[in-house]
Design a protein with these regions (language model features):
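Noncatalytic alpha-helical scaffold of FAD-dependent oxidoreductases
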Residues: 1-181
Length: 181
């Protein structure tokens, strides 16, 4: 119980909330509070239908560094309009500092992922993305990788950012994260 209370006081949590197991004794209260989502919705699951995502056979990722966040954001807008980007994560200066990224000081990065069912399709996706990215000033050369170890390292870095940034905030404060389109 103390460990759960302590962890919740120092870390903002996304995903399943287990704090109700500590705060409430009544089973109904525990279940009701476990079903409260990040937007404050309460729900009851009586049935679920899962739709799986297509698993592409070819993927590539790139970690693109920009000198400032404004240029990175302009690039995101341009990519959204015309490039086959499967996912894109913006990592600001504080995020990169929190995971000890040593690429450069004060940078912003975009972690971009593209996918296809063929090698030719993937190459076409990368070319289309690079055509857009080429319109912007990067800190270093753009490099797409299909190497699973290299790309896993980038995505692992990204996964570690939220706990790292959350750990730098003052005790008792809340880190707010939201996905935007």
């Amino acid at each position: 119980t103390q460990r759960i209370r302590h962890k919740y006081s120092i870390k903002n949590v996304t995903g399943l909330n287990i704090l109700p197991f500590v705060l409430y004794d009544d089973v109904f209260d525990i279940i009701a509070h476990c079903l409260v989502g990040s937007e404050g919705t309460l729900g009851f699951l009586s049935e679920a239908t899962l739709e799986t995502s297509h698993l592409y056979t070819h993927t590539a990722s790139a970690m693109l560094y920009f000198k400032d966040i404004s240029e990175a954001c302009r690039c995101v807008v341009a990519l959204k309009k015309s490039a086959p980007v499967f996912s894109c994560e913006l990592l600001d200066r504080k995020s990169l500092e929190s995971v000890n990224d040593t690429t450069g000081e004060g940078l912003t990065a975009l972690l971009i992922d593209t996918k296809s069912d063929s090698e030719e399709g993937l190459e076409g996706n990368i070319k289309a993305i690079m055509d857009v990215v080429g319109q912007f000033e990067l800190f270093n050369d753009a490099h797409f990788s299909t190497d699973p170890e290299e790309t896993a390292g980038w995505w692992s870095l990204r996964s570690g950012i939220f706990p790292s940034v959350g750990g730098t905030r003052p005790l008792g404060s809340t880190a707010i994260i939201e996905d935007i389109a």
